[in-house]
């Protein structure tokens, strides 16, 4: 487990310098002071800086011969994140960027939230379904301990803490994501409630909790269910699954005496499952 520090603050007009590489470089621990982090997806890596850093990237390419630079982009943070520059209402939750102020009205739950450079601005169907499932679970008997695997920008962990979970562990294997989550924890003053860690889900799944949330994809979920059984947890919210993957996962849940309570399907693709283990019955 790595201790997670925060990312540098970003504002709508912050100019980003983005280098796209084919392949995955080693973790950059001695980059320039304006290095923001690396995001990896589908065999490509995106290195983010606040200044042009072609010389640094060239050195990285020389050191790691299997890497290839495919693009260099500049854009503002507003352009990178699209529309997320104003408060966003999702159910009872109102997500407000740190540079804006908004007082929640009525039963709204306010969260100061910055998606940073990573996936997770709150609008993806799996995120919406997970938020609904967390509200259902936390609306019953009090939930104290929550484990969030694949936390991304930390939104689900923040929501759980605001709904009463006082001991939350949020995990992501991407340091940039973990740093973003840590920054959002600080934005909301929830350092006492939420611990953010950078590591693999398999290393944390045995940490017992009343609520496990894993919006993490089929391969890891299937491995966690098959090898760990998830018996250290009571409620499970499993997401990031397409139809075929869900069909393959359901027998694994049944084999491990995990009962499916509710299933959300959106856009005829994304599935989110609310389950309870034998431990919770």
Predicted regions and their residues:
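Short glycine-/acidic-enriched loop or helix-start segments at secondary-structure transitions
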Residues: 57-59, 105, 158, 223-224, ...
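Conserved SAM/SAH cofactor-binding pocket of Class I
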Residues: 123-201
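A short helix-to-beta-strand connector/capping loop
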Residues: 68, 91, 107, 166, ...
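SAM-dependent Rossmann-like transferase core, predominantly class I methyltransferases
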Residues: 81-140
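N-terminal auxiliary segments of SAM/dcSAM-dependent transferases
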Residues: 2-104
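Alpha-helical structural signal in soluble globular domains
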Residues: 45-46, 63, 159, 163, ...
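S-adenosylmethionine
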Residues: 173-279
